């Protein structure tokens, strides 16, 4: 029976490792001669250069097929969503409640409105132009600076009594609060057939708490008639219109009953806007519960 191989000592193992790192007899470093290391390095360098070039070529060809001014994928909704400011979400949608006599209960709501309208100051709209045509503002060319399209100004003062400039409390202090309604953007969307879309806010019966003694909701709209002027449409996308600002409509509720919760729905009335989608409660309208305590 052959004798067991003698175990190598630590010094022997270190000597073999040093010889593997550099063998002076054969001129090899890590098992290869310097010339072979050069050829291997050149091969991998060329390989990765070619792979990087092919990848860049694929990206270039892909980018040539994409229109930078039109999104490839858009929401399947035919109508824009509608948002509300101030927006306070409860367990079941928008729920806004405050006490007239407690400033702290509505200070946060007015702060939200002031912050939101900060983007509608004249200074923030200086790159936009004044529009008054009340007709669709079609733009076939990129005539604005930096190869963009013009955007129409919308400043907070157009909301008049609900601008926060005349009444910093937006009517919350007197129990006649202002709410701002905004339509979400859809590229090249035309809301109606040459008729400005308008906002219509009404009381709506709560299925769980029906009421028959409530009077119709009285509303003051700003701009007048609660319309979104047509010259803000169509929207051509963020790249084409980097300075675009959504038009707004403010609704000031004048006769909300105190110490009771009411359900209010604000709909966009336009030919091409629908608000009866059971799968999306914010398509074409916004619903919210409002409680004003006294």
UniProtKB/Swiss-Prot annotation:
User: Its membrane topology, per UniProt?
Assistant: Single-pass type II membrane protein
Pfam families xrefs: Na_K-ATPase
Question: Which of UniProt's keywords are assigned here?
Answer: Cell adhesion, Cell membrane, Disulfide bond, Glycoprotein, Hydrogen ion transport, Ion transport, Membrane, Potassium, Potassium transport, Signal-anchor, Transmembrane, Transmembrane helix, Transport
Report which superkingdom the organism of origin falls in.
Answer: Eukaryota
Keyword tRNA processing on entry: no
Q: What processes does the entry annotate via GO biological process terms? A: cell adhesion; intracellular potassium ion homeostasis; intracellular sodium ion homeostasis; pH reduction; potassium ion import across plasma membrane; potassium ion transmembrane transport; proton transmembrane transport; response to lipopolysaccharide
Q: Report one GO cellular component.
A: apical plasma membrane
* Known tissue expression: Stomach.
The disulfide bridges present are 131-152, 162-178, 201-266
Per the UniProt topology annotation, the Extracellular ranges are 58-294
A molecular-function term among this protein's GO annotations: ATPase activator activity
- Show the segment(s) annotated as immunoglobulin-like: 194-294
Protein name according to UniProt? Potassium-transporting ATPase subunit beta
Source organism? Rattus norvegicus
């Amino acid at each position: 029976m052959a004798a067991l191989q003698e175990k190598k000592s630590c010094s022997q193992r270190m000597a073999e490792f040093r010889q593997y790192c550099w063998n002076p007899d054969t001129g090899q470093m890590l098992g290869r001669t310097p010339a072979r290391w050069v050829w291997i390095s050149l091969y991998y360098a060329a390989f990765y250069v070619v792979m990087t070039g092919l990848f860049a070529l694929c990206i270039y060809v892909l980018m040539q097929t994409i229109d930078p001014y039109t999104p490839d994928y858009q929401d399947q909704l035919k109508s824009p969503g509608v948002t509300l400011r101030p927006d306070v979400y409860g367990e079941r949608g928008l729920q806004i409640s405050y006490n007239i006599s407690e400033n702290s209960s509505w200070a946060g709501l007015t702060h939200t409105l002031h912050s939101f309208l900060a983007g509608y100051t004249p200074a923030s709209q200086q790159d936009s132009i004044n529009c008054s045509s009340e007709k669709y503002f079609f733009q076939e060319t990129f005539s604005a600076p930096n190869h963009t399209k013009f955007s129409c100004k919308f400043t907070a003062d157009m909301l008049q009594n609900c601008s926060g400039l005349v009444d910093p409390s937006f009517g919350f202090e007197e129990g006649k609060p202002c709410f701002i309604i905004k339509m979400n953007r859809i590229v090249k969307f035309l809301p109606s057939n040459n008729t400005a879309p308008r906002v219509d806010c009404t009381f709506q019966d709560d299925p769980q708490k029906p009421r028959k003694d409530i009077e119709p909701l009285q509303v003051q709209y700003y701009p007048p008639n609660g319309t979104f002027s047509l010259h803000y449409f169509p929207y051509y996308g963020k790249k084409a219109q980097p300075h675009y600002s959504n038009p707004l409509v403010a609704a000031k509720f004048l006769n909300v009953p105190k110490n009771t919760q009411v359900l209010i729905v604000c709909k966009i009335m336009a030919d091409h806007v629908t608000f009866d989608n059971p799968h999306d409660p914010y398509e074409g309208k916004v619903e919210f519960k409002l409680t004003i305590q006294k």
